[in-house]
Structures are given as structure tokens and as C-alpha cells.
Design a protein with these regions (language model features):
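Sec-dependent N-terminal signal peptides
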Residues: 3-13
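Cell-envelope and extracellular/periplasmic
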Residues: 17-142
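Accessible peptide chain termini
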Residues: 1-2, 142
Length: 142
């Protein structure tokens, strides 16, 4: 009976797939002309390869905790890129943009929605096709 939990643990570790945090998804924006850390999880010692549509390839080997990271260097601004992360499985990030990344943080006013604005209908109709927003699901960071 003592061997069953160990067997289950080993089964989970051996069948681990490459995973990425939610921030790395389709429509991702990376800072142009710089090194961008990209990380995730995989089975310990599994080779993880990251290939970009702009011709760069990186590889990493997760430690005993399954964590891995590479620093992907980006070209000048552009859109329509793709990033493929491969280990025992494959994840393809589509419609990746390279450009300027702005991080906005603050107090409660950072959660102000367009619907609460003075001219909400007018603001909602603004066409900004190159503008992408990522909002963290976490509301409190303390």
C-alpha cells in the first residue's frame, strides 16, 4: 500500500506536458528589440524547444521542480508572428505582436471600465486594431 502513492506521483511526473502560464497565449505582445523571458513547466529533464517565426530557436531543460525559462530576443515591431513551444506536446501561440509593451498598475482607479467613462459609447467605438490589452485575473496583489 505504501508504494501506491509513490507510483501515482511518478505517473503524474512522467506524463507531464509542457505548460505555459496564462500570460503567454494567442495575441501576445512582446517588447521589440529586447530579451523577453518566456517560462513554463514540463517534466523534469525533458527537453523544451521554443521556435519563433522570426527565425530564432531556444531550448531549456526543466529542473527537478519542472520549471524552465528561455530569453527570446525579438526583432523590430511587427505583427502576425508565431511561437511554438515543444516538449512531449506542442503549444503554438498565434498572432503574436512585437512592439511596445506598457505595464499599467495602480490603485482602484486602474479597474475603471470604459462603461463608467463620461463618453463611454464614443470611446467604445474607437478603432485601435494594433492595441492589445491583457488584464490579469487576479484583482489583489498583496
Amino acid at each position: 500500500m505504501k508504494g501506491v502513492p509513490l507510483f501515482l506521483l511518478l505517473t503524474l511526473v512522467c506524463s507531464a506536458e509542457v505548460r505555459l502560464p496564462a500570460i503567454f497565449s494567442d495575441n501576445l505582445v512582446l517588447q521589440q528589440r529586447s530579451g523577453n523571458p518566456i517560462w513554463g513547466w514540463a517534466a523534469p529533464k525533458e527537453k523544451v524547444t521554443l521556435k519563433t517565426s522570426w527565425g530564432e530557436t531556444y531550448s531549456a531543460t526543466p529542473g527537478s521542480d519542472g520549471r524552465w525559462m528561455v530569453v527570446a530576443y525579438t526583432p523590430k515591431a511587427g505583427t502576425g508572428h508565431q511561437i511554438t513551444v515543444k516538449g512531449s506536446n506542442e503549444i503554438v501561440l498565434k498572432n503574436v505582436a512585437i512592439g511596445e509593451v506598457w505595464l499599467c498598475a495602480g490603485q482602484s482607479n486602474m479597474g475603471w471600465s470604459t462603461g463608467n467613462s463620461f463618453e463611454a459609447e464614443k470611446e467604445a467605438k474607437v478603432n485601435l486594431p494594433g492595441f492589445r490589452i491583457y488584464r490579469s485575473a487576479r484583482e489583489h496583489w498583496h
